[in-house]
């Protein structure tokens, strides 16, 4: 098959915060850059980020990037890489002020400086009193970020391909990534995007679960592409369940609500977080708050409702003026999806899948890593990853609120800054052959030639139910082993699924089938990884192994796609500018 070819210095797959920040930096460096997105860029899932960007600006009180680093390392349950966390926290203020200069409309304090609100897990002076570190644009920070970055990419002549779906990476005979193939959703045209640098910025994969804050586009496309290219994925057992999704809908209710003074109640009207986190209370780490809500429900203190047992988030005491000025989006979402007015009554909430802490292992420069037979990190030529799809790892076993947007802009920026230098170090590479390119079309050809078999919608439902029931907030060995066996059966069913719609123009069923392949890859890697880690750490909480085991598990886990087996990778405990923070018991 002779495909049309579009050639660029770099191709960025995904136009959320990380992808657009990387593309902007690449274009500003004078390189030609294609930005591929399966939706219009400002509809990327970053648009739903509400609370803000956590960064030590010191606008509301004295602050220090080292305090931010301490909180992030502690929040990660000590498997966040401290060199990467140091880089993110140290570089963060500069990266955020760049956004301000681009025109991002932050909320303001009375003196005109950027407004910062308290978020969970934040402290002053290495674990002291509560900090207010999260820079916000009301409760629509992600929306403001995407529109700002989109405008800047237009200004800097990034070539944007909206509603193009990346199929798979193209690797040459030497193992270097030489771009990708993609299909135009509007016309069905398939094109080879040739580039010496390919940046995966495809976001999360929360749609492997039944209940998630993630948009329908979050289907783990980058995970699937990486695994099929033989790239390992790291810490895939670590999925954050946000404490406050709207019960019955899964729609996110930002942690900023609790930062502004909201608090959780059980059916007896008790502020139950005082029992689980006496100091931080409702602003403890997200894994702590999510588990606390589920314990209240398991022990019979959950609130009753048509959506099942849940907790209540009380905001009405803050007053109408505060809610309308600082949390206008939450008022709208609550009235639409929960049918309650937070000015008058609490919001029904329950933990729901929110964020993938694991992903593709990378350097601070965004270069994707594998591990050789000697256990050493090696760079995969031509491949980069940034944002939620990447595992730098700054989040470890539990992400702090507001650090996701900081991750996007700091490491999207870093990948763009170092991309040309990385390619120069890589040297000359041979072009991909026709057979290399055709190999990336195998999935598309399989779906296009399948007219009989099982309905992929039913397979997707079965996958999501399996993950929700066996790999949720609390986990247990027998249930996870059973869940893995169920996934093996579902994976076999997927091989015999059918594509009914054979049209070319806006064939959304074809895209959904291709997405289902990626959901399956992501779910399977998650299940194998979760069975492997026999301890409780951060978001990975096991009834049969309730304690953290630093002797055995102070490490990353790596899922190897070729053998579907697990290995370990060392956590980086060597920051460059200050001593490392040693592991301690996490208390809030």
Swiss-Prot record:
Flavinylated by SdhE, flavinylation occurs at a very low level in the absence of SdhE. It is found in: Cell inner membrane. Disruption phenotype: No effect on anaerobic growth on glycerol fumarate medium. Keywords: Cell inner membrane, Cell membrane, Electron transport, FAD, Flavoprotein, Membrane, Oxidoreductase, Transport, Tricarboxylic acid cycle. GO terms for biological process: anaerobic respiration; electron transport chain; tricarboxylic acid cycle. It is a peripheral membrane protein. Its EC number is 1.3.5.1. Changing residue 45 to S: No binding of FAD. PROSITE patterns: FRD_SDH_FAD_BINDING (PS00504). GO terms for molecular function: electron transfer activity; flavin adenine dinucleotide binding; succinate dehydrogenase (quinone) activity. InterPro entries: FAD-dep_OxRdtase_2_FAD-bd, FAD/NAD-bd_sf, FRD_SDH_FAD_BS, Fum_R/Succ_DH_flav-like_C_sf, Fum_Rdtase/Succ_DH_flav-like_C, SdhA/FrdA/AprA, Succ_DH/fumarate_Rdtase_cat_sf, Succ_DH_flav_su_fwd. Pathway: Carbohydrate metabolism; tricarboxylic acid cycle; fumarate from succinate (bacterial route): step 1/1. It catalyses: a quinone + succinate = fumarate + a quinol. Transmembrane segments: none annotated. Belongs to the FAD-dependent oxidoreductase 2 family. FRD/SDH subfamily. Two distinct, membrane-bound, FAD-containing enzymes are responsible for the catalysis of fumarate and succinate interconversion; the fumarate reductase is used in anaerobic growth, and the succinate dehydrogenase is used in aerobic growth. This is Succinate dehydrogenase flavoprotein subunit.
């Amino acid at each position: 098959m002779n495909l049309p070819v579009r050639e660029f210095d770099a191709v960025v797959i995904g136009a959320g915060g990380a992808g657009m920040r990387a593309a902007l930096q690449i274009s500003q460096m004078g390189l030609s850059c294609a930005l591929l997105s399966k939706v219009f860029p400002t509809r990327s899932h970053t648009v739903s980020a509400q609370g803000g960007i956590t960064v030590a600006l010191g606008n509301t009180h004295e602050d220090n990037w080292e305090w931010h680093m301490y909180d992030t390392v502690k929040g990660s349950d000590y498997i966040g890489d401290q060199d990467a966390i140091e880089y993110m926290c140290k570089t963060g203020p500069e990266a955020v002020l760049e956004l301000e200069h681009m025109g991002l409309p932050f909320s303001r304090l009375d003196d005109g400086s950027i407004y910062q609100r308290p978020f969970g897990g934040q402290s002053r002076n290495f674990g002291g009193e509560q900090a207010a570190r999260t820079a916000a644009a009301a409760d629509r920070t992600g929306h403001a970020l995407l529109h700002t970055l989109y405008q800047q990419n237009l200004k800097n002549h990034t070539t944007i391909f909206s509603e193009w779906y990346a199929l798979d990476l193209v690797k040459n005979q030497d193992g270097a990534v030489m771009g990708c193939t993609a299909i135009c959703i509007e016309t069905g045209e398939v094109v080879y995007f040739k580039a010496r640098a390919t940046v995966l910025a495809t976001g999360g994969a929360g749609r492997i679960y039944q209940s998630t804050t993630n948009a329908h586009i979050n289907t783990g496309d980058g995970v699937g592409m990486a695994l099929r290219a033989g790239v390992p994925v790291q810490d895939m057992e670590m999925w954050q369940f946000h404490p406050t999704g709207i019960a019955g809908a899964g729609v996110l209710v930002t942690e900023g609500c609790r930062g502004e003074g909201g608090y959780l109640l059980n059916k007896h009207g008790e502020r139950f977080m005082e029992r689980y986190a006496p100091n931080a209370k409702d602003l403890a780490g997200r894994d702590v708050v999510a588990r606390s809500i589920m314990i209240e429900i398991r022990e019979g203190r959950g609130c009753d409702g048509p959506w099942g047992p849940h907790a209540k988030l009380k905001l009405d005491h803050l007053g109408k003026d505060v809610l309308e000025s600082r949390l206008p989006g939450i008022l709208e979402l609550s009235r639409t999806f929960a049918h309650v007015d937070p000015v008058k009554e609490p919001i029904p909430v329950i933990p729901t899948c929110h964020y993938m802490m694991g992903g593709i292992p990378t350097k601070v420069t965004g270069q994707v890593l594998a591990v050789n037979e000697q256990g050493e990190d090696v760079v995969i030529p031509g491949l980069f990853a940034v944002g939620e799809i990447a595992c730098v790892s700054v989040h470890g076993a539990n992400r702090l609120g507001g650090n996701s947007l900081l991750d996007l802009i700091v490491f999207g920026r870093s990948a763009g800054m170092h991309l040309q230098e990385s390619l120069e170090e890589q040297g000359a590479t041979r072009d991909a052959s026709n057979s290399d390119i055709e190999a990336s079309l195998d999935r598309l050809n399989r779906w296009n030639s399948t007219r009989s078999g099982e309905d992929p919608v039913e397979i997707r439902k079965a996958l999501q139910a399996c993950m929700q029931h066996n790999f949720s907030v609390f986990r247990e060995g027998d249930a996870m082993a059973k869940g893995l066996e169920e996934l093996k059966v579902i994976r076999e069913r997927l091989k015999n699924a059918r594509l009914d719609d054979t049209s070319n123009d806006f064939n959304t069923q074809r895209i959904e089938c291709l997405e289902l392949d990626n959901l399956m890859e992501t779910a399977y890697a998650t299940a194998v990884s979760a069975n492997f880690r026999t301890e409780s750490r951060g978001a990975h909480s096991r009834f049969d192994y309730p304690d953290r085991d630093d002797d055995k598990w102070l490490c990353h886990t790596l899922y190897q796609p070729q053998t579907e087996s697990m290995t370990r990778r060392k956590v980086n405990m060597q920051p460059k500018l200050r001593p490392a923070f040693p592991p301690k018991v996490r208390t809030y």
